[in-house]
């Protein structure tokens, strides 16, 4: 123990600390400065950035023994407060720099460190600074953050008035389609929004901290579990195993596909008989501190009989592979696609055919905030779970039988959360904390470290694909054949739905009258597959978009013109036989053409013998919704103070549920003249909010947006006075009229895809885009640099352009990572952000251009579609096509690491 007298945010603090204690822990736990966020705990993400004696440091790797007496420290709390924002914070709000917001305090503190030393930086200075200080963002694509720093610098330098950093309301008062800032933005940029780990510091005395005992092998029988030594460790309350679980000890995948050969009850909460993947949780140590719990977890002894581990789809699908789940074949689901005529004769007689084998790998989500959850038994006897769930009502039914409670005895609440990008479509820590709270009767808190985030949360499922096109010599597509094998890891939840995506999106964007294909889902012992932005489209469209370029080359056609020739037009149908609701792709290609020609000319002019430049194109398509007649519910309530509360369970993991709720409600309530700041929204809670469905598949703006629209329209009708005007709250109460009105909406025009043919109308609203990538390839090293990305986007009528821009920038950045660096194949090497190929700012170009070519959707609320999936449908395919354009070599298996490109160049 040592004494430190330091000044934090201008206030002298007399502290007694362990010399080895981390500055981040002291600031958060002893001083309550939870604006200092902790992400990676390895100095790789910058979320914990503070200014220490004039220098930006990462507090999570700075030990107190290195902090001098008298040190001056500035955290986000010292930069600005909600009522007194610093220009950087104002600029962050204005430019949409805070999406999930978890990284925002660290970025803003880092940016202040820059402006304190360089008051007039260039954009490249800003980018170099954030790269040097390892400030990582997974949401924004970095461009809005640089925009914010530049504008803040201009204000600080007196080049702009500070009023330029404030949103200007449109003259008509309408915020639909504007850049109205997110309602949560100020809390995010000031560090005052409490995320799961922050809330954990506010739990009552007696709260137990949990640590997982995890498998260090990928497949094994469990012969015994010895907890005796762990129980003697300091601070340990108990060690929970499968014997303490009161329910079925399984998370159900809620299987709805009749041809699935499994029953969905294959994922243990705490492993009992077998380990199915590396990192599986075998026991939970409950202790008085996280450190004590983790130390004791190392003392639990597990006797294992190791089994063959199948770490890829082909290995698990081999005839001699043992069943991972005894009684269920490893290949447990098949989805055919049968459209039009038999393709065999068509391929035999076609002018041109082309074929390719493709692979998209196990992309990790890599949020900056690791998984976190807590649970407690409420005074009403119910078990309450607070987590990063993006499907609170969905998860309620997935975990209730496993923990041993009826759904009405379990409550799920979505915390303010960092980005998830889909991994939280699957439950992760929810069942674990519920089991612990029920077993101990005490509040419990569980926080994953970053290694656990990487190793024990789901990943994008890898696909092995073979796709063939048959075409006329003029480029008209005649037929397609496809085969795709989906490695979904050991747990089946949603694996069948993901496999169906291949039938829906391989070849999407083009009129292909005749299709035959088969998708198969296989259980393996690698990490389980979960939803990831784009959900099946990045795999599907990588194959078909690369193949389109291969066909263009064989025909001697320009790749853009081949796409133009075959893009959807009236009378055409998509792969499942559905006619698109709008036909914007030809228009988008027409508008892209001059940009494309200019990019080609620039690439040709600037290419050298050592650095080759190229341009690539791809089309992206995705549906907004869950398959079939998806539905949502919302409530609109007039409050006594004249405000309106929109009640939904629209989970916000950075995509903008706050502005989605407020923007949609404001548009619907315009006749009433309600100001946007008078519209409130709710945090998802299964006990107090309606079932709005999960935040995945770009469904919420369409499904819950429509439900909000209906609820608000119904509220308007309820409030209308016969002679004009609207009743007040008091008038409604006096007349015994309701002040809270329900709105329901169902995608009634959608149908499920057929189990035998794959045909159907799965979505009533789709999103469409055309991507262009510009790259430079260093032929000596194989290193690919993306110089610029352009997306022509049709997203209907935009609810909020600021949120939409941010979603697109972030999706493009993730596409660059998917194409070039991101993977989770090596369980140990890829267990950190850097190891897994996280794209920092210098890997993402500052040139990210968006052109909206929007066509209002008949079934979208006020014409809107979804947003989030589109920007990650196929940007990686455009990048790979650009590498081919630059060098003449094609990469078929992602990611296109430099050594892989170099090997192809030398072949």
Swiss-Prot record:
Residues that, per the record, bind [2Fe-2S] cluster 1: 40, 45, 48, 60
SMART domains membership: Ald_Xan_dh_C
Keyword RNA-binding tagged: no
InterPro entries (alphabetical): 2Fe-2S-bd, 2Fe-2S-bd_dom_sf, 2Fe-2S_ferredoxin-like_sf, 2Fe-2S_ferredoxin-type, 2Fe2S_fd_BS, Ald_Oxase/Xan_DH_a/b, Ald_Oxase/Xan_DH_a/b_sf, Ald_Oxase/xanthine_DH-like
One Pfam family of this chain: Fer2_2
Gene Ontology molecular function: any one: iron ion binding
Cofactor note: Binds 1 Mo-molybdopterin cytosine dinucleotide (Mo-MCD) cofactor per subunit. Binds 2 [2Fe-2S] clusters per subunit.
Binding-site positions, Mo-molybdopterin cytosine dinucleotide: 653, 869
SUPFAM superfamilies for the chain: 2Fe-2S ferredoxin-like (SSF54292), CO dehydrogenase ISP C-domain like (SSF47741), CO dehydrogenase molybdoprotein N-domain-like (SSF54665), Molybdenum cofactor-binding domain (SSF56003)
Catalytic reaction annotation: an aldehyde + A + H2O = a carboxylate + AH2 + H(+)
Keyword match Signal: no
Cofactor: Mo-molybdopterin cytosine dinucleotide; [2Fe-2S] cluster
Residues in 2Fe-2S ferredoxin-type domain copies: 2-79
Similarity comment: family membership: Belongs to the xanthine dehydrogenase family.
PANTHER family: XANTHINE DEHYDROGENASE, XANTHINE DEHYDROGENASE SUBUNIT D-RELATED
Protein name: Aldehyde oxidoreductase
